[in-house]
Amino acid sequence: MNLILVGFMGSGKTTVSTLLGEALQQPVYDLDDEVEKAACKPIPQIFADDGEASFRDLEHSALKEVVKRRQGILATGGGTPVAERNQRLLEHAQAPVILLTASPAETARRLGDGEGRPLASKLTPAELADLQDARRPAYDRCADLTIRTDKLSPTAVAKLIIAFLRIHQDQSA
């Protein structure tokens, strides 16, 4: 794995990973997509049929497989880094972990009504902000770099990450 993006839902992980994949000519893996493929159903259906615990087990299994890949950019799910077992996988992935953040107000704006996001659709804006705050320590433990995305375009975020990767590679050489 060349790079892993973490952050709360709506922080820009999927959009930025797609831009990075194009710019760096690397495959892009979205962990939510990997979970849906493994379960043969969309995430809202997994939550409805099997519950969040089952989803988190599927997510862990998918993460374990994806981080083994030599090349690529991974956009994790918003809750992925919260589980300690996932933190260990991210730590041992030997890839820079970039945390994308946004303010609670910007997150609420981006998520809208939370359609397609089982947790967001059940929460008020205040509860969403509380969840974001509660997850922050887990995100911080994993991150090699944090980028606040509120006032940056996805392209600008991707360019910052590419600059970081160049510096990171120079220091590793």
UniProtKB/Swiss-Prot annotation:
Record-listed E.C. numbers: 2.7.1.71
Intracellular or extracellular location(s): Cytoplasm
Residues the entry annotates as binding Mg(2+): T14
One GO BP: amino acid biosynthetic process
Highest taxon listed in the record's lineage: Bacteria
Record keywords, A-Z: Amino-acid biosynthesis, Aromatic amino acid biosynthesis, ATP-binding, Cytoplasm, Kinase, Magnesium, Metal-binding, Nucleotide-binding, Transferase
Binding-site residues, substrate: D32, R56, G78, R135
Cofactor: Mg(2+)
Chief place where the protein resides: cytoplasm
Pathway where it operates: Metabolic intermediate biosynthesis; chorismate biosynthesis; chorismate from D-erythrose 4-phosphate and phosphoenolpyruvate: step 5/7
Enzyme class at the top of the EC tree: transferase
Purpose: Catalyzes the specific phosphorylation of the 3-hydroxyl group of shikimic acid using ATP as a cosubstrate.
Assembly mode: Monomer.
Protein name: Shikimate kinase
Organism from which the protein derives: Limosilactobacillus fermentum (strain NBRC 3956 / LMG 18251) (Lactobacillus fermentum)
